[in-house]
Amino acid sequence: HNRVLELNQTADGWDVVTEKGTISCEHVVNAAGLWAKQVGRMAGIELPVSPLSHHYLLTDSIPEVAALDTELPLTVDLEGFTYMRQHQQGMLLGIYEINHQHWMMDGAPWDYGIELLNEDIDRIENELTLGFERYPVLQTAGVRNWVNGAFTFSPDGNPLVGPVPGKRNYWSACAV
């Protein structure tokens, strides 16, 4: 990995200027995560994404989960604004925050090292309550760890995936 410094459209594709040199390519895919907005601007595109604070919790080991021979699938509760998946021998409950908090509207600073953000459990209390009601195993499982980190979202919560209109051979894979 190395940082993209410029994107220059050419007659037959793109020149991607990085910290380690220039790469000429036919197609560019913006999959820059927390830096997607800045990388889009390098191509003259204003992507409707920004990093938000995103909470999830990890449970202690759950005997029923530990006893399984296969990994449980991801479960999403769109009405409850939560998702849950297996994490080692416990579970991970993630929150799609109704009262979301923007972290950096213009994207993460280039030197951001993926440090965690301060927890704000009060802000996600309603979603947590719904999650604990929908997934009863959480009511008896201990919480091993709370995590609040930055994650890039679009305004409607959907991913921006596919070709970008008006930019030949420029693709987006953002907010996924």
Cite the ranges covered by each PLM segment.
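C-terminal catalytic lobe of FAD-dependent flavoproteins
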Residues: 79, 88, 111-176
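Extended catalytic-interface subdomain
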Residues: 73-108, 124-125
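Central beta-strand plus flanking loop segment that forms part of the substrate or channel wall
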Residues: 43-70, 126-129
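A conserved short coil-to-beta-strand element within the FAD-binding core of flavoproteins
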Residues: 1-14
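Short loop/edge segments at beta-strand edges and connector loops
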Residues: 1-2, 18, 145
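Core beta-strand elements of the Rossmann-like FAD/NAD(P) dinucleotide-binding domain
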Residues: 17-27, 31
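Flavin (primarily FAD) binding-site architecture
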Residues: 30-45
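Short, hydrophobic/aromatic-rich segments at coil-to-beta transitions
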Residues: 12-16, 73, 169
